[in-house]
């Protein structure tokens, strides 16, 4: 086609970098593209010359031969000979712009079905508070996709096999024009597979996959909380065409407990004591995740006061460290008193005015005895 100097055609120096050559070619190709210059043979000629020049200068081997021997160094060596027709130029243009912009172009070829990773699966698991606190092993029943044993995964009925898609010629892609670009899109007939199944397998309906139910043992670590996700690699759906399987995500939901309330890895309980116990102090027994433990309530304990028992909470995930048990004391006020109890309380009230400590303490003990606390 052109015998003009290729560097002159693109408007770059002879020592221009590959990136500079790409940028300049892109600029010229957009400027002189026939869609932007209808009925302009001069622009079409410039477009073709730019494509020919870029075809040589982008290739290190062709460029080296051109730099040394000029156009003569390209004769019979796949470069500098021009393009047979306009389709060659546009295909070349699409190839280059696909390379420049990172999208698939009309020259892209699919080499048969591509490996596809399997889909990830989600399983919502509800467990008891005790299971979350101590950890447990549970068995999940999950849907499972397996290769059809009738067609060995081909999807074709016995005695038949998949055929090359006639619509795309087995490429899995067809060309479509968008403006002055030609891009490649998946073939609508074979859905990008490059092949079709004329007679589908009756067992799997042509999918090559069967649905089954499987059982999977899952270890629940101690300390999990609602919303925690357990990832089981490779336990999702199988991949297609040799692709890797997906993962299984077990999303945990922990049921509420009647005794314990959760605050992170700490546990909270409310323990009721009489006002005599609160006033004089006492030793009480409180529940834990294991056996009950003894807690000393000091004299003068107020309702709502919280006592902390260290390492009696929930374990941190992946650690031996545990949270604490918080015991919130609630002081009960008696609602039904005997006559003697009322008299003692009135005596207590009188003594409270002057606060003679020993006498108050003595009456308080009497009240406790009258109420069956001692």
Curated annotation (Swiss-Prot):
**What is the organism field in this record?**
Nitratidesulfovibrio vulgaris (strain DSM 19637 / Miyazaki F)
Reported cofactor(s):
Zn(2+)
Q: What is the lineage of its organism?
A: Bacteria, Pseudomonadati, Thermodesulfobacteriota, Desulfovibrionia, Desulfovibrionales
Which cellular components does GO assign to this protein?
cytoplasm
Q: Please list the GO biological process terms of this entry.
A: chaperone cofactor-dependent protein refolding; DNA replication; protein refolding; response to heat
Q: Zn finger regions (CR-type) covering which residues? A: 135-213
The residue intervals holding the CXXCXGXG motif repeats read 148-155, 165-172, 187-194, 201-208
User: Quaternary structure per UniProt?
Assistant: Homodimer.
The terms under GO molecular function for this entry are: ATP binding; heat shock protein binding; unfolded protein binding; zinc ion binding
Q: How does the entry describe the domains?
A: The J domain is necessary and sufficient to stimulate DnaK ATPase activity. Zinc center 1 plays an important role in the autonomous, DnaK-independent chaperone activity of DnaJ. Zinc center 2 is essential for interaction with DnaK and for DnaJ activity.
Domain of life the protein comes from: Bacteria
Residues annotated as binding Zn(2+) 1 are: 148, 151, 201, 204
Residue ranges annotated for the J domain, each copy included: 5-70
Keyword Metal-binding part of the UniProt annotation: yes
Task: Give the protein's recorded name.
Answer: Chaperone protein DnaJ
Q: Which residues does the record give as Zn(2+) 2 binding sites? A: 165, 168, 187, 190
Q: From the Swiss-Prot or TrEMBL record, state where the protein is found.
A: Cytoplasm
List, alphabetically, the PROSITE patterns matched: DNAJ_1, DNAJ_2, ZF_CR
A Pfam short name: DnaJ_C
Say which family it is in.
Belongs to the DnaJ family.
The note on the cofactor says: Binds 2 Zn(2+) ions per monomer.
What's in the keyword line of the UniProt record? Answer: Chaperone, Cytoplasm, DNA replication, Metal-binding, Repeat, Stress response, Zinc, Zinc-finger
Q: What does this protein do?
A: Participates actively in the response to hyperosmotic and heat shock by preventing the aggregation of stress-denatured proteins and by disaggregating proteins, also in an autonomous, DnaK-independent fashion. Unfolded proteins bind initially to DnaJ; upon interaction with the DnaJ-bound protein, DnaK hydrolyzes its bound ATP, resulting in the formation of a stable complex. GrpE releases ADP from DnaK; ATP binding to DnaK triggers the release of the substrate protein, thus completing the reaction cycle.
